Amino acid sequence: MEWIKQSGMLLASGNIVDYPGQTLDELAEDILLMKELEISWAPVIPYLSAANTPLAAEGGRGSQEKTLREIAILRLMMPEVNITAQQPGENPENGLADTEGNLKALNAGANMLFADMLPDALAKSFSVVDNRTTLGLDHIKKMADLAGMQLLYK
């Protein structure tokens, strides 16, 4: 890890929150490690089961509340870190690109959104999460407007 930082590369580390069997102590340890590593980016998402994976049988979704709390804690502990706002909302059909969930994450302290540029035909074949939804820059512009944030991109 030190070599990565010394080379000038940015270091990212994040969490999948509330996967089956995960404890609050483990989440706390992860947060402290992220601070110790002085990361520049923290992708934090709730657990979403995906079909045909070992944890699929355990089903369920990770807690949005726990995920939003982790985002808020990270923002307080590391004001300069970039935190993603890719959060599901109440409708699982929207996957990680949900307006309600994204806005809650931005309000909790997240400051980054992804533009998923994967073509729809490929997205259906790439099943890291079920119901993957690809939304581009229009979604990001909408989210920034709803959150009262200014977009900075090149």
Put a short name on every predicted segment:
Residues 1, 23, 27, 67:
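Aromatic/hydrophobic pocket-lining residues that form the small-molecule binding cavity
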Residues 1-16:
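Radical SAM/AdoMet-radical enzyme domain recognition
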Residues 35-154:
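Auxiliary Fe-S-binding modules of radical SAM enzymes
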Residues 16-31, 89-97:
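Active-site glycine- and acidic-residue-rich loops that bind
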Residues 12-20, 50-56:
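Active-site-proximal beta-alpha loop/turn segments in soluble metabolic enzymes
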